Amino acid sequence: MHDLMMTAVQGDADAAYQLGYLYETGDGVPQDEKEALRWYSMGAQKGHSKAQFNLAVMLEEGRGQVTDLRKAFFWYEKAAQQGESNAQYNLALFCTLGKGCEVDLVLAHMWFSLAARKGSSDAIHNRDAVAKQLKAEQLALSQQWVAQWIEKNAVAKS
């Protein structure tokens, strides 16, 4: 445990994520949501997508601190941009409901579409429900954004 903490303090994002998870679940350490939040935050700031997602969930649910939907939106977006499908789904919900942001059904459709690519039946259902509320040009814009996101991320991975 000491080695993991030292590695995290030295800037290792994965070690910080692992510590956040241990403190969140109480696996081998006393459960402590404030500590989990602290370690997830450290990992998130270093770009660890799972730390970003878990931090967003805790911020959304008010675990370890007061609920902060704007910050939750921010971290869901960071994780979603890295391809975390659960973050893409949650971000789409935020855009649909106006949680931590203005309602934006075009953006919601885009994120539901990306999450649906991983086979999420909820994402598929919600994408289709949102599509029914969009005008043809809005749907085309969302589909254009999806294609651009896929292309950008394919280039980034190569």
Give residue ranges: language-model regions.
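Terminal, low-structured helical/coil segments at or just beyond the last alpha-helical repeat
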Residues: S121-S158
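Short helix-capping/linker turns of helical repeat alpha-solenoids
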Residues: V9-A13, T25-D27, D32, Q45-S49, ...
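N-terminal segments that cap or nucleate solenoid repeat domains
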Residues: M1-T25
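Hydrophobic face of amphipathic alpha-helices that form TPR/SEL1-like repeat modules
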Residues: Q18-T25, V29, N54-E61, Q65, ...
